[in-house]
Amino acid sequence: MKRNWISTEEWHPSAGFKLEVEAMNTVISDKNTLVVAGPGAGKTELLAQRACFLLETNTCRYPKKILAISFKKDAADNLKERVELRCGKELASRFESKTYDAFAKEIVDRFKNSLDESYRPSNNYNIAENRDVRRAFEIAGLSFRGNQTDFNRAYGNKLSINKLPLHTDFIDKIFIDAWNVLLKGNKDNNFESSLTFEMISRLAEYLIRTNRYIKKAIEMTYSNVFLDEFQDTTSIQYDLVKACFLKAKTIITAVGDGKQRIMLWAGARKSIFEDFQNDFLSQKRTLIMNHRSAPRLVEIQKTMYNRLNEDAVELQTNEKWNHEDGEAYLRLFEDHIKEADVLSEEIARLVEKGIKINKICILVKQNVDVYSKEIINKLSQLNIKARNEAVYQDLLKEDIIKILVSLFRLASSDRRPDDWDYIYDILGELYGIDEGYKPKILNDFIIKVELMINDLNANLNIVDEKQFSALVDSKIESISYEKFASKFQQYKSKDYFDDLVDKFKRSVWIEYNETKDWIKAIDNFEGKNSIPIMTIHKSKGLEYDTIFFVGLEDSAFWNFKNQPHEDRCAFFVALSRAKRRIDFTFSSNRPAGFSNLQKHDCINEFYELFEDTEIVKKIEY
């Protein structure tokens, strides 16, 4: 690859970005580094700029690559897009961004023939769901009468605790037998080979640990590795990272924030920062910028540091803010009806002032429908849409959904360049078309895509849901399911693929039936015209102009006495989603928990915090 590389001395951040000192030190570092980066610190930009430095200076020497591992697919996609934006697609082709699950699955799928026969899964194994795991245990001889939650606690969650190979010295035989059923399937019980992602990670770790040639191949492929949201890393995931890169020349940059460690319930490793520093002899750098939140909101966030056992840091805010910017309210209501009245009116006022409707978010600790039903009804009376985002959040991240959305946009005359670029890129990958092909092949491909979109446009004048369903199916058939399954591992399950398409059909048709406008229907489906409502866990990594946290009550934080640190982290995550304003509500009467009568005795420290700041304005109704 011939290219004029930039010298490390002459390199400067892409797009004119000014990085704080420790961020710049991280970007150009040649050592393993743990970066402690709080909310709004610009973690995605930091990693994108580091990728640019490594690629543009050839510090990541061609043809080696950079591997970025994230928890969520959308986070992995966002980072990949940011790197492409900062240094161009040619250089970014050596930047791989994927989830832990995808990384582990690629290793197993590529090298599974190197596994001992006893641990080698079937070629076309499925991804196991909770009910599949339970059935495997039952086939293995377990008799368990509890519900699925009880089963997960007693058996399902413990299935992959141990590294392979499994021995009865360390684990009950029923677990080994269930592993075998899941690995190999069971014809007598019509059970196909099905693996959980935790099992896949254990198989990947075992492959690398027992085969030095595979470990060497991975080391030779990647000169640098980025680990995002590192505070949520599980022991299984960390074991895989160590198997791949411990004592290797690969340089690892791990970015996380202990104040946002809210995934302990999902197996996050409490000691992950300390373990990484000890195992990889990493340096530690702390970022002090908060580019997201207004100064007064950052002051509230800082008061949480002591309660989260974090060292006090002199946080700095973005220069776009004035010193007095930021609003915070604590609203105390007699009942949830009055709460809904006031919040709906407040939201209506914000919209009238020009705040985009999807830049306002309603957060709850749990049970979205319980805490937001009345608010949704009141907002509807004011012609403001609000919806439970959990129904859409994962769906909208799916590749097949993104493809269908872009096709319908282009067919509906909303011909945005981004959609054209995306469709040409993704269909080019599906059809195996490369930019280096001869002009005639490229031209034929462009004509094929345009004909597909023109045909879709010509058939948009449909009258019922059945016709819409047939139209969507015809577009998928014209590309072919096999191409989707070949490109996207998750779509090898035809049932999973069909379920996603069915959800798209139902959701978009509901919106079109209401608006009779395809652009509005797609916009509504994407949530551009509605207020998102979600749990704190679903809000992680997101930001909004204004946050309304509904139900700062004991019944919402019902397990606070048993997990105070994790609930404090959850509170901190909610607090730090807001850019300009945050409102907390308490209702003395609410149909939630064991009693309608609500209190805040257990979580009163949050209320004391509000008083201590002298920033949060308390309003009683």
Predicted regions and their residues:
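P-loop NTPase Walker
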Residues: 1-115, 216, 576
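Conserved RecA-like helicase ATPase core segment
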Residues: 2, 235, 240-324
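Accessory N-terminal region flanking or inserted into the helicase ATPase core
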Residues: 2-37, 41, 45-46, 65-67, ...
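Coupling/switch/interface segments within P-loop NTPase motor domains and analogous charged loops
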Residues: 116-192, 439-488
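Walker B catalytic acidic pair
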Residues: 229
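Helicase P-loop NTPase motor core
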Residues: 282-283, 289-382
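Conserved helicase/translocase motor-coupling segment
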Residues: 340-423, 453-495
